[in-house]
């Protein structure tokens, strides 16, 4: 019986304890594909300095959300759910996954690291991998960096890969986001039954920011963020704005920032704000700390009520989206025998 192509989910990773915060930050800031800290020979020394200076404050933030990042546990749960629905599929002629598909997880900046997972997969007999980055919108700083590291490692093991670069406007992914938004709007009374409009609610799409230099060099990230939003607002008639969060490092970042946008909306008289973390597919420090704690407190001080839509995590609709993306990838790779 032929061995089906395995699936590898790639994600950022996050510290699994408070003690892991500083080395996680060092790994993050050491990557020139995410942020360039002077000449290349100074990257690691500057990364060490920045990670040491930021570790204390970052540890305080993680201590408020359980003492670690939940991204590892959630990503493994997503992998388990995806593996289950893939193995319910039958009929390889139609492009469905054959019985026995395995879904693994690898992280860019913390365990399980890509460089550790790949040799384990090879030892287990894996020779073909469908690679799915859990960043819906492509950027050289996220998906690009992860895939470059993966290619570097797989080259030593003879594993053939097919990488899915982005899926920012995949219909089932959009449906999952829209469902999450509809659920989130219930806090404010839901949608109008007649017009499908949210009454007195302003939606703020908040995406992870990116150094402006990447966009100037042709990175499609911002365009794909807007593409995701365009697909959403075709399904829900809502007033909305777009902002960017999680800036870090001494460079110019894409704006407007989320805190600036909240202040601007408050000045316009907006009272009810529903935040949609549009570039994230799971909970981590950006949702649980930045949005749920910092931005929520800021909004309250400005006389606003801020709520966040639930992250996709293992939402059944989202898992079905991942399944469809993977199955189409198997077809495109020519591995649907």
Question: What residues fall within each predicted segment?
Answer:
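Active-site-proximal alpha-helix that buttresses catalytic centers in soluble enzyme cores
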Residues: 1-337
């Amino acid at each position: 019986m032929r061995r089906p192509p395995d699936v590898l989910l790639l994600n950022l990773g996050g510290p699994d304890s408070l003690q892991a915060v500083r080395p996680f930050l060092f790994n993050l800031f050491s990557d020139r594909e995410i942020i360039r800290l002077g000449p290349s020979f100074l990257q690691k020394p500057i990364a060490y300095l920045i990670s040491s200076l930021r570790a204390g404050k970052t540890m305080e933030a993680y201590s408020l959300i359980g003492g670690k990042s939940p991204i590892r546990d959630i990503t493994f749960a997503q992998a388990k759910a995806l593996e289950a629905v893939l193995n319910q599929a039958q009929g390889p002629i139609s492009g469905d996954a054959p019985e026995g598909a395995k879904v693994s997880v690898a992280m860019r900046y913390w365990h399980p690291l890509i460089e550790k997972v790949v040799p384990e997969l090879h030892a287990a007999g894996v020779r073909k991998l469908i690679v799915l980055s859990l960043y819906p919108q492509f950027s050289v700083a996220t998906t690009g960096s992860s895939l470059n590291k993966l290619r570097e490692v797989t080259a030593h093991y003879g594993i053939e890969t097919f990488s899915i670069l982005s899926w920012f406007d995949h219909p089932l992914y959009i449906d999952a986001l829209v469902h999450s938004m509809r659920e989130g709007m219930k806090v404010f009374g839901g949608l109008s039954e007649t017009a499908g409009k949210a009454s007195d609610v302003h939606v703020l799409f908040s995406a992870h920011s990116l150094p402006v230099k990447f966009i100037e060099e042709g990175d499609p990230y911002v365009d794909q963020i807007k593409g995701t939003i365009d697909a959403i607002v075709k399904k829900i008639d809502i007033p909305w704005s777009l902002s960017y969060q999680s800036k870090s490092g001494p460079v110019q970042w894409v704006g407007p920032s989320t805190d600036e946008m909240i202040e601007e909306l408050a000045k316009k008289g907006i009272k009810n704000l529903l935040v949609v973390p549009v570039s994230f597919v799971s909970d981590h420090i950006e949702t649980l700390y930045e949005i749920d704690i910092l931005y929520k407190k800021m909004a309250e001080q400005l006389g606003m009520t801020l709520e966040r839509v639930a992250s996709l995590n293992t939402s059944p609709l989202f898992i079905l989206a991942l399944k469809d993306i993977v199955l189409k990838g198997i077809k495109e790779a020519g591995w649907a025998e």
